[in-house]
Amino acid sequence: MITDADVAAFEECISGGGVAVFPTDTLYGVGCRPDSEDAVARVYALKGRAPGKPAAVMCFSLDALPETGPRTRAALEALLPGPVLVVLPGGVGVRVPDLPAMARVRVPVLQTSANLSGGPDPRRLADVPASIRDGVDLVLDGGELPGVPSTVVDLGRYEETGEWEVLRAGAVPVERLATELNRDMRG
């Protein structure tokens, strides 16, 4: 269970340029400030991840998301918070996890799964490789998590055309996405 003290420690760690392992609504993540080159390099090095491979920016409330057009904003409000990563125009991926305990975190977090690149998804803290746990500044234990990765949906053209594409199947069924994203296309 995440406490208020955990949330404060997390926000302090991330704000200060640190790297943290933390629970999300799907898997354990490892993250840092997206504007800290050193911290981003640490995250990628800990995972053994190729430097050019993208990572998502996690916000902990809808209010913290970047400005979008009205159609895209309505889609974000229908899908988030929840286990969906949305790719916006320009290729930026954003997430708002369904984590009420973390809702007061006001700093964005560059986040990726807390595993070695290509490794199994960590649903328990013990599943996070020791090399990652030992290489970060803060570790938060949220118990056992669902273990199903987030669904990734590309809304890059959604504002103009209403087109969307699932890039990775995951925790949210495609049928639910279709219901929400095709809503304004119906009569």
Q: What name fits each language-model region?
A:
Residues 1-187:
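Active-site-adjacent structural elements in enzyme catalytic cores
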